[in-house]
């Protein structure tokens, strides 16, 4: 990552001393780059597996990142298609310029980019769904800015206080689900739709995973060491959409429902309902819900909530999907973990004060800190899990290498695999598969209703006994499935080890995937040593041959396999043990690998043997270079390749000999199964990848004062709901999402290994320029700005002196291009920091005026949101500034991100928001069915008062002076009516007086916080005095004929003399708790 002394993940930034667009501005860019060069076998394929996670209004920042990924993907599509840029493109000039820049950079680096696997959690699920849909349909996502600016308005998301039922504070189905269901099928077509591609490439491989949380879990079972039945309730839900699903227009409602179901933060949004096999019809503003059985492994309908409530990231299935993707050229795999912030970074210069026992946390502070801790720990757990996976992959790769090294020393004809090791492998793998199948089977059976008639969805009576308490269904199923798998994988006594391709094929897909992984490990070591175009092309051909040897069919989900098996009449009439046996047989049939696939796998390496031998022999023998240098890496890779080749044997490089390919196949089988026999049963497939966290905790050259998500994003406030409050706040977060996203993508694209390869192939090594100078020159041609004389100012680190980024620093960073003995860095952050300005200038040209307009005139025809004077002054300066340095520099002065709810306290928008939120919250509290009857009258009164107050605030448009006047008038008239003896007048007057008092308090709070508590005290006194009014007195204490509310609902109050004292004590306790919740007030 970018250098940082305080642990923050730095990232490329922006500043441009050149005129608008620089010498390579928008017009210059369009003239400089007409069409990309053709894609060849030497072109590198950069594949992004993108995981998005983050809550509620932080979705807007993630949407900005999504927009940049979408532009990069479209640029890659342009390079694959070739030709000139379409003249009928609907992109804005600035977006088209950004797309061209991405196309120029990947053309310079000779790569294409593929965003093929995506996953989303919580609000990240919405953006992941949009990005996945755009990939398959060729849509342009520029329009999601307006989608989020409109959809995210808090005053629109808040439920109407007049609703009869208020299950949450915000509309989930009526707003979020409805908007997504409407907009997903109508995304604007981009300049490179799939219809322009050849038939085979029209539906690019795409897999989308979206998580959710089940409110009523699905139960499976297992037994402990003593045979005791343990109920395992699984609350994790996972939606899966493939490219085939995403290409069908009728999938859009299911995709919208999945995204809405993941973004269902409790209390804020109501739970989402998932139909299973039968959808639900449209009801009011809620669209029709489709059946979700094809897209999830659930077994019945469910109410679900936010996907981020549990540690529910589909890491395992994501890695498996990565492994299954075939390749035809060199592939670099990167996992983009998109999260607005993983938490505040420790700053030794500003260490927070230690916790003090004499300063206890209040009720609200403790609650908010607890929620923040859960969120932060969840994100950190994800990153740790991925990092742990990487560490495990490295350890397993090392173990595989040492096994090959050991096997190479064995006597000729002695195999690495022994019968005992094969037995261990069979037992471990069969046990693992049996546990998975048993869990899926019992999960299905636990949700089946008792058998009543011929329905195939019910539980057969013959299975019921083993599923009751004290039954041994788990043990019976596991043992039977294990036995069936072991029988299928058994060897004849006379030949304890498999040798022919047909014998290897009996071990199914798990063994084949392991052997395929071993073959790819050999090729990865060879790629490190490749220097010429011919070597790269040869290795790319071998990689494609390995993937082409056998491509697994799209296997159905286990839940589908179980449901199909359980519906067969013959199975239902038999025993549960027979059902488990049939399930294992169906599973083995589904994972069958043909024998000739093993032969083709072996032949791929046999054909490549001369190339591999030549690469190992030509590597440098110098091992004294620094550990991370190119020479040292070549030395290590050569040693690994020689070890594998020594184990695999000697081959002429032709698969004509019928012995060569089968021999190579069983040697791969031996290496794979021996390694797996020594690993835990739950060991995953070895699939290495780079992990890059894309966050807002980054710095920039144009805005050096903005370094963290807490500083930049309004969505970090109010437990991540902040950006919903104001349109300008949403526009601010969207802009920062694009700025941050562009910088991160440039950083990832500038892979030092690829840059070194390009410089070695294209730079003139005999010319006057060094490789580093040649590459910097190419980046300047692309659009990177020239350096100012003192360099770009950088923020001071650790209280030290100010620093400047200079061209010499970049040349030093790129020194590895000319000296193979220098360490090869993991990334080149300073170069990316400087280059990313070319993109970020285009972003500012498109977004800065838009942000200013949301401050001054957020929506034409509507009253503007109130903003502080500093924000309005800044917005005016932005609109008046000419494009170029002066305008870009205004980003560092951006006051929008610095606005807070406190600074907006006196605004009409705040008054309207508070009034509506209070009325909605009162309605939500009154909608709780489990409320004791004694609490219902006070809540009804509270709802009446807050609803009346909201209506008056709507009429006064939230203006403080008008609100106070209206409140005072209602207060006077209400008191006059309340003291009358007529019941109707008394009740109406009391409500009017309460509403008036509430309005006076609200209006006064807008003007001055100092008067707030005085007015609240006045309101309390007024409430006490109201007890003397006839209406309240009779309502509470009744008359001779009627007992009143106290006599009906609180008769115990007068039953003993000390009961009223208890009530007074409880009131005092509440007051103490409120004081404890705000310990800062004295």
Curated annotation (Swiss-Prot):
Highest taxon above the source species: Bacteria
Pfam family, one: DUF3376
Record has Hydrolase as a keyword: yes
Motif (DGA/G): 306-308
GO molecular function: hydrolase activity
Cellular compartment(s): Cell membrane
Limits of the PNPLA domain: 50-319
Swiss-Prot/TrEMBL keywords: Cell membrane, Hydrolase, Lipid degradation, Lipid metabolism, Membrane, Transmembrane, Transmembrane helix
One GO BP: lipid catabolic process
Membrane-topology descriptor: Multi-pass membrane protein
Motif (GXSXG): 120-124
Listed transmembrane segments: 959-979, 982-1002, 1012-1032, 1057-1077
Transmembrane helix in keyword set: yes
Cellular component aspect of the GO annotation: plasma membrane
Active-site positions on this chain: 122 (nucleophile), 306 (proton acceptor)
UniProt xrefs under InterPro entries: Acyl_Trfase/lysoPLipase, DUF3376, Patatin-related_protein, PNPLA_dom
Protein name: Uncharacterized membrane protein Rv3479
């Amino acid at each position: 990552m970018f250098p940082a002394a305080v642990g923050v993940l730095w990232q490329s930034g922006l500043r441009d001393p050149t005129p608008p667009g620089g010498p390579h501005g928008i017009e210059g860019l369009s003239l400089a780059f007409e069409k990309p060069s053709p894609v060849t076998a030497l072109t590198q394929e950069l594949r992004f597996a993108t995981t998005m996670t983050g809550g509620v209004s932080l979705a807007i920042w993630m949407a900005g990142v999504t927009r940049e990924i979408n532009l990069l993907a479209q640029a890659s599509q342009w390079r694959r298609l070739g030709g000139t840029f379409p003249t009928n493109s609907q992109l804005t000039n600035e977006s088209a310029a950004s797309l061209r820049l991405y196309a120029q950079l990947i053309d310079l680096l000779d790569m294409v980019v593929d965003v093929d696997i995506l996953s989303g959690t919580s609000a990240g699920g919405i953006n992941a769904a949009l990005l996945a849909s755009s990939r398959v349909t060729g849509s342009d996502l520029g329009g999601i800015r307006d989608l989020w600016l409109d959809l995210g308005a808090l005053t629109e998301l808040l439920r109407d206080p007049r609703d009869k039922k208020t299950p949450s504070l915000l509309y989930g189905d009526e707003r979020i689900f409805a908007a997504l269901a409407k907009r997903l099928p109508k995304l604007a077509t981009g300049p490179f739709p799939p219809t322009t591609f050849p038939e085979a490439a029209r539906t690019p491989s795409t897999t989308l995973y979206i998580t959710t949380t089940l409110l009523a879990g699905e139960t499976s079972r297992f037994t402990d060491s003593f045979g005791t039945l343990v109920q395992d309730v699984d609350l994790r839900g996972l939606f899966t959409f493939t490219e085939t699903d995403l290409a069908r227009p009728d999938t859009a409602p299911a995709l919208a429902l999945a995204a809405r179901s993941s973004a269902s933060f409790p209390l804020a949004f109501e739970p989402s309902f998932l139909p299973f096999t039968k959808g639900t019809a449209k009801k009011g503003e809620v669209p029709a819900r489709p059946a979700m059985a094809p897209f999830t492994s659930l077994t019945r309908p469910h109410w679900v909530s936010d996907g981020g409530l549990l540690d529910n990231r589909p890491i395992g299935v994501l890695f498996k999907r990565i492994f299954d993707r075939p390749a035809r050229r060199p592939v670099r795999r990167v996992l983009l973990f998109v999260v607005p912030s993983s938490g505040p970074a420790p700053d030794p210069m500003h260490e927070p004060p230690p916790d003090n026992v004499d300063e206890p946390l209040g009720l609200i502070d403790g609650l908010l800190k607890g929620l923040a801790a859960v969120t932060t720990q969840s994100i950190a757990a994800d990153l740790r899990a991925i990092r742990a996976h990487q560490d495990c992959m490295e350890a397993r790769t090392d173990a595989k290498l040492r096994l090959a090294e050991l096997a190479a020393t064995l006597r000729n004809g002695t195999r690495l695999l022994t019968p005992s090791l094969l037995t261990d492998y069979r037992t471990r793998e069969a046990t693992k598969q049996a546990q998975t199948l048993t869990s899926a089977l019992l999960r299905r059976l636990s949700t089946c209703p008792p058998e009543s008639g011929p329905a195939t969805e019910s539980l057969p009576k013959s299975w019921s006994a083993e599923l009751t308490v004290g039954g041994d269904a788990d043990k019976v199923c596991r043992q039977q499935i294990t036995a069936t798998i072991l029988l299928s994988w058994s060897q004849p006594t006379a030949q304890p080890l498999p040798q022919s391709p047909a014998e290897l094929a009996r071990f199914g897909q798990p063994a084949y995937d392991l052997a395929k992984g071993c073959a790819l490990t050999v090729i990865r070591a060879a790629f490190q040593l490749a220097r010429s175009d011919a070597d790269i092309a040869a290795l790319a051909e071998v990689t494609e041959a390995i993937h082409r040897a056998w491509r697994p069919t799209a296997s159905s989900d286990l839940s589908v396999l179980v449901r199909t098996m359980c519906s067969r009449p013959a199975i239902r009439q038999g025993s549960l043990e027979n059902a488990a046996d049939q399930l294992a047989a169906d599973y083995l049939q589904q994972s069958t690998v043909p024998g000739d696939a093993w032969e083709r796998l072996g032949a791929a390496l046999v054909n490549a043997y001369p190339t591999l031998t030549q690469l190992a022999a030509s590597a440098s023998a110098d091992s004294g270079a620094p550990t991370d240098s190119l020479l040292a890496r070549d030395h290590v890779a050569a040693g690994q390749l020689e070890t594998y080749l020594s184990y695999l044997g000697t081959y002429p490089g032709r698969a004509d000999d019928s012995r060569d390919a089968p021999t190579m196949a069983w040697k791969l089988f031996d290496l794979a199964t021996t390694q797996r026999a020594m690993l835990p049963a739950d060991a995953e497939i070895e699939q290495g990848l780079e992990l890059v966290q894309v966050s807002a905790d980054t710095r920039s050259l144009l805005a050096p004062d903005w370094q963290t998500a807490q500083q930049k994003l309004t969505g970090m406030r109010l437990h991540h709901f902040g950006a919903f409050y104001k349109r300008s706040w949403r526009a601010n977060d969207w802009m920062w999402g694009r700025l941050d996203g562009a910088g991160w993508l440039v950083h990832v694209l500038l892979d030092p290994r690829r840059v070194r390869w390009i410089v070695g192939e294209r730079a003139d090594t005999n010319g006057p320029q060094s490789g580093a100078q040649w590459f910097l020159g190419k980046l300047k041609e692309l659009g990177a700005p020239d350096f100012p004389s003192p360099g770009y100012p950088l923020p001071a680190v650790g209280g030290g002196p100010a620093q400047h980024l200079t061209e010499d620093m970049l040349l030093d960073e790129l020194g590895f291009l000319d000296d193979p003995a220098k360490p090869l860095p993991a990334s080149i952050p300073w170069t990316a920091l400087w280059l990313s300005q070319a993109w970020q200038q285009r972003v500012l040209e498109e977004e800065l005026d838009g942000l200013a307009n949301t401050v001054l005139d957020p929506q034409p025809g509507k009253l503007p949101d109130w903003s502080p004077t500093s924000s309005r002054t800044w917005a005016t300066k932005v609109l008046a500034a000419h494009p170029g340095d002066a305008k870009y520099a205004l980003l560092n002065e951006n006051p929008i991100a610095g606005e807070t709810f406190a600074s907006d306290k006196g605004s009409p928008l705040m008054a309207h928001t508070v009034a509506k939120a209070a009325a909605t919250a009162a309605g939500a509290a009154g909608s709780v069915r489990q409320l004791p009857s004694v609490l219902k009258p006070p809540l009804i009164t509270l709802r009446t008062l807050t609803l009346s107050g909201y209506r008056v605030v709507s009429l006064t448009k939230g203006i403080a002076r008008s609100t106070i006047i209206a409140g005072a008038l209602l207060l006077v008239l209400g008191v006059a009516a309340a003291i009358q003896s007529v019941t109707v007048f008394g009740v109406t007057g009391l409500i009017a007086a309460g509403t008036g008092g509430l309005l006076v308090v609200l209006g006064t709070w807008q003007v001055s916080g100092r008067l707030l508590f005085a007015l609240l005290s006045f309101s309390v006194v007024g409430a006490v005095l109201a007890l003397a009014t006839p209406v309240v007195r009779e309502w509470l204490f009744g008359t001779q004929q009627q007992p009143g509310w106290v006599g009906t609902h609180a008769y115990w109050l007068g039953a003993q003399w000390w009961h009223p004292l208890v009530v007074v004590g409880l009131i005092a306790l509440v007051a103490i708790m409120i004081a404890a919740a705000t310990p800062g007030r004295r």
